[in-house]
Amino acid sequence: MSGHEDATHPPPDSKGSRLPSRTPIVVTLRGEAGAEVQIELVGRAHPEQQDYWDGNWLRTRVKVRAGGFRGEFEPELRAEEFARLRDGVRVCMADLRGTFVFETLEGQLEITAKGDGLGHFRAECRAEDVAGIGNELTFTIDLDQTYLPPLASQLDAALKAFPVLGHPGA
């Protein structure tokens, strides 16, 4: 270790993560009846890049459970998409009529959850296994406000491990 590192703050690994590679980073939108969208962040797609446009692509593994459907695919998603989702979830934790959105640049995973003001949320979701030309699954996940704090904490951990790099105007 150099003089600037310690065991609690390891340097970035070859995948651009600041956590040991054995530590999985998972973000899960859970709902009623076992429905969920689980996103495992595997690493940066271009760890050698530090700019906004190339450096923020993340390799992920997405698992979907909705009713009788199960599926898994491996899209590349962007760090700032997780930041926008986290910000929206935090708003909804305070405003039960709020909406949080996960909208991806290539359209492979879309989630829009709206609150009814009483603590219930309905997430309208769409997953596409190949960007622009793939098979598509649309589904809903019903959840309540108690699912939001753990989701926000997972998003905080994801963004700590894979922070947004640079700025779009740079």
Regions found by a protein language model. Name each.
Residues V27, F73-P75, F100, L137-L143:
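Generic detection of short hydrophobic beta-strand segments and adjacent strand-loop junctions
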Residues S2-D51, G55-G67, G71, P75-L77, ...:
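Charged, alpha-helix-forming regions
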Residues R44-D51, A94-D116, G166-A170:
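DNA polymerase processivity clamps
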Residues V89-M93, L159:
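Short amphipathic alpha-helical signal-transduction/dimerization elements
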Residues V37, D51-R59, V101, Q108-N135:
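Intrinsic, low-complexity N-terminal interaction/targeting segments
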Residues V64-G68, A79-E81, A127-A131, Q145:
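Beta-strand elements of well-folded, non-transmembrane domains
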Residues E128-A170:
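Mixed-charge, glycine-accented linear interaction segment located at domain edges/termini
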Residues F82-V89, L151, L155:
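Short, structured motif recognition centered on aromatic/hydrophobic residues
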